[in-house]
Amino acid sequence: MKTMRKITAIIRREKLEDVKDALELMGIHGMTVSDVKGRGQQMGIRESYRGMDYCVDLLPKVQLEIVVDSEDLERTVEAISENARTGDVGDGKIFVTDVIDVVRIRTGEHGRDAI
């Protein structure tokens, strides 16, 4: 069984379509996308509402989860990074973890065949 990796990318909402398009051009169609909130170096933003100042310290982001074969890892991470980057604080993070197995529930397929 080939080694698989899970890529978890936290990116700006407005960059999601660019990242999805780049991944689809590479033949990567399967992904899970979730709305998340978080903070890092950006530390939130100040907003004014009806004359009152508020600090929003958990900012909305999008989380993508993608499982790929190890040989596709570098180019996939590169595509996400290039297409999610604005150059500003708050562009996000990419995490890579090992995947022991994947099982397609409908068919019982394992490993690469289940991705």
UniProtKB/Swiss-Prot annotation:
Gene Ontology cellular-component annotations: cytosol
Family matches, as InterPro entries: N-reg_PII, N-reg_PII-like_a/b, N-reg_PII/ATP_PRibTrfase_C, N-reg_PII_CS
Keyword Transcription regulation set for record: yes
Residue intervals passing through the bilayer: none
Species the sequence originates in: Methanothermobacter thermautotrophicus (strain ATCC 29096 / DSM 1053 / JCM 10044 / NBRC 100330 / Delta H)
Keyword Transcription regulation: yes
GO biological process: nitrogen fixation; regulation of nitrogen utilization
Record keywords: Nitrogen fixation, Nucleotide-binding, Phosphoprotein, Transcription, Transcription regulation
Upper classification of the organism: Archaea, Methanobacteriati, Methanobacteriota, Methanomada group, Methanobacteria
Protein name: Nitrogen regulatory protein P-II 1
